[in-house]
């Protein structure tokens, strides 16, 4: 067999031409110990705090503690797959998540990876998970309502676009329901919603997603889920991820956004676990010293941007779970002091059938009537005061003393307001319907209706008005005020008489 030298030389020449010196220089370290989502790594002398690092099996972590001889790394993924002796290399990047309209209608984990089995998310952009909050010059005062569709809240504890309103109460008092009703009520308003579930049961998240889908709310919502089965680092990072996803719509698309953090108590517990495993010194209730900053840097990212920056907004509804109504515990007081008001839900009100179980006495909105349309200001101004007086009188009336007619009338009016404010779950009311009902009860057009029939009458009233006087609702919707109170009064009197004749 003859060797063709010219062929061999041509192949060799081609190989020499194509030869590239590919020398990658990575700064690497070695895993000393791993457990509970925390790795101690030797080496990585130049790693920066908060920098992402990559383990040899492709799992990512973040450098948290920089010590003399080692680096404390939190692992974002399955830490059981990492072994002692694995190499770890720097990436020179910070943690970023995919953002953009591709995420709408999807369920993702805090790293932006899909959990709903609908295939990959081909997002074109990413955003850092930790972004600086907008400064004073970038903001404008909150003045546009964020309607929740819940009568008790829209009338007495109004929420504005760009506000941070805490929902606080014991477990099982309907905190999540209020937040989800608010998301459902944004249908058709162009508001983008992000629901962040932290440390919840996977079954609960699944039923929440199903409910949003059935109500047609999933198409404008992103669900970020870090269930109780996920490692603590993922639960800790979840709210920041959700916030970054919403910030894209606020800054880039100039839209109004709503983010629900459900709930921040579990995030604080996850952060406490991480901090103790990293051997950071514990403080009150064993939380680390920077647990206030944990929540303040998250909630300060909510804002109503100035017109120069596109006038987008990010409204935050953080949820905190209390133990036995203890609002003065460490985390609740921290978050109360950061937010612009709180909606306090009481278990005894919930148990007695007053749902939503909002305690109007200690719930406040520090934005106040700036976040209400004029029609709501016209009718709801007196209601909070009347309800507070009713609660005082109610305690007094239980003593069984004889009451003068004026006090009795006030008690009856209060009872009617309480009945009118009751509302079934996931059935938010448009603001014009709320205005009509509240006008009817506060101006005395329900005084002849027996208290047990007030809710039934409320349904009857709205049905009649939609059928026969839809122009009344249309006028309130367009003008945002009640222009003809006399006419509305006549309509309500006629409907009340018709109801009393029939029932």
Curated annotation (Swiss-Prot):
It catalyses: ATP + H2O + 4 H(+)(in) = ADP + phosphate + 5 H(+)(out). F-type ATPases have 2 components, CF(1) - the catalytic core - and CF(0) - the membrane proton channel. CF(1) has five subunits: alpha(3), beta(3), gamma(1), delta(1), epsilon(1). CF(0) has three main subunits: a(1), b(2) and c(9-12). The alpha and beta chains form an alternating ring which encloses part of the gamma chain. CF(1) is attached to CF(0) by a central stalk formed by the gamma and epsilon chains, while a peripheral stalk is formed by the delta and b chains. This is ATP synthase subunit alpha. One of its GO terms (cellular component) is plasma membrane. It is a peripheral membrane protein. InterPro entries: ATP_synth_asu-like_sf, ATP_synth_asu_C, ATP_synth_asu_C_sf, ATP_synth_F1_a_nt-bd_dom, ATP_synth_F1_asu, ATPase_a/bsu_AS, ATPase_F1/V1/A1_a/bsu_N, ATPase_F1/V1/A1_a/bsu_N_sf. PANTHER family: ATP SYNTHASE SUBUNIT ALPHA, MITOCHONDRIAL. Produces ATP from ADP in the presence of a proton gradient across the membrane. The alpha chain is a regulatory subunit. It comes from Leptospira borgpetersenii serovar Hardjo-bovis (strain JB197). CDD domains: ATP-synt_F1_alpha_C, ATP-synt_F1_alpha_N, F1-ATPase_alpha_CD. Belongs to the ATPase alpha/beta chains family. Keywords: ATP synthesis, ATP-binding, Cell inner membrane, Cell membrane, CF(1), Hydrogen ion transport, Ion transport, Membrane, Nucleotide-binding, Translocase, Transport. The keyword Nucleotide-binding applies. SUPFAM superfamilies: C-terminal domain of alpha and beta subunits of F1 ATP synthase, N-terminal domain of alpha and beta subunits of F1 ATP synthase, P-loop containing nucleoside triphosphate hydrolases. The lineage of its organism: Bacteria, Pseudomonadati, Spirochaetota, Spirochaetia, Leptospirales.
């Amino acid at each position: 067999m003859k060797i063709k030298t010219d062929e061999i030389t041509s192949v060799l020449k081609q190989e020499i031409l194509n030869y590239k010196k590919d020398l990658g220089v990575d700064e690497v370290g070695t895993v000393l110990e791993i457990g509970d989502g925390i790795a101690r790594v030797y080496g990585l002398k130049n790693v920066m705090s908060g920098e992402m690092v990559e383990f040899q099996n492709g799992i990512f972590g973040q450098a948290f503690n920089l010590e003399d001889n080692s680096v404390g790394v939190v692992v974002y993924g399955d830490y059981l797959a990492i072994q002692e002796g694995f190499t770890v290399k720097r990436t020179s990047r910070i943690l970023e998540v995919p953002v953009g309209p591709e995420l709408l209608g999807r369920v993702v984990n805090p790293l932006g990876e899909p959990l709903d089995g609908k295939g990959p998310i081909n997002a074109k952009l990413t955003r850092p998970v930790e972004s600086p909050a907008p400064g004073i010059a970038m903001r404008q005062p909150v003045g546009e309502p964020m309607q929740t569709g819940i009568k008790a809240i829209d009338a007495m504890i109004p929420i504005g676009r760009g506000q941070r309103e805490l929902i606080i109460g014991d477990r099982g008092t309907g905190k999540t329901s209020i937040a989800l009703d608010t998301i459902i009520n944004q249908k058709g308003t162009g508001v983008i919603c992000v629901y962040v579930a932290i440390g919840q049961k996977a079954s609960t998240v699944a039923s929440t997603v199903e409910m949003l889908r059935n109500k047609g709310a999933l198409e404008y919502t992103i669900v970020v889920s870090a269930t109780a089965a996920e490692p603590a680092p993922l639960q800790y990072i979840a709210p920041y991820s959700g916030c970054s996803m919403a910030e894209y719509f606020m800054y880039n698309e100039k839209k109004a956004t709503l983010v629900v953090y459900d709930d921040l108590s579990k995030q604080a517990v996850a952060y406490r676990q991480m901090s103790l495993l990293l051997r950071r010194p514990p403080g009150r209730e064993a939380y680390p010293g920077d647990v206030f900053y944990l929540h303040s840097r998250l909630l300060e990212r909510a804002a109503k941007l100035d017109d120069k920056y596109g006038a987008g907004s990010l409204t935050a509804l953080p949820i905190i779970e209390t133990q036995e109504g203890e609002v003065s515990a460490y985390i609740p007081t921290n978050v109360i002091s950061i937010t612009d008001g709180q909606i306090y839900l009481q278990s005894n009100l919930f148990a007695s059938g007053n749902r939503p179980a909002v305690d109007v006495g200690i719930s406040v909105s520090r934005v106040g009537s700036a976040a209400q349309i004029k029609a709501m200001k016209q009718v709801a101004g007196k209601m909070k005061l009347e309800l507070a007086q009713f609660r005082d009188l109610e305690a007094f009336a239980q003593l069984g003393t004889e009451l003068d007619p004026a006090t009795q009338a006030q008690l009856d009016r209060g009872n009617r307001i309480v009945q009118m404010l009751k509302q079934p779950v996931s059935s938010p009311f448009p603001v014009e319907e709320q205005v009509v009902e509240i006008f009817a009860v506060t101006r005395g057009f329900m005084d002849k209706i027996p208290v047990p029939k007030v809710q039934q009458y409320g349904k009857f009233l709205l049905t009649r008005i939609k059928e026969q006087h839809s122009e009344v609702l249309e006028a309130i919707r367009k003008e945002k005020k009640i222009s003809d109170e006399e006419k509305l009064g006549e309509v309500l009197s006629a409907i009340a008489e018709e109801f009393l004749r029939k029932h």
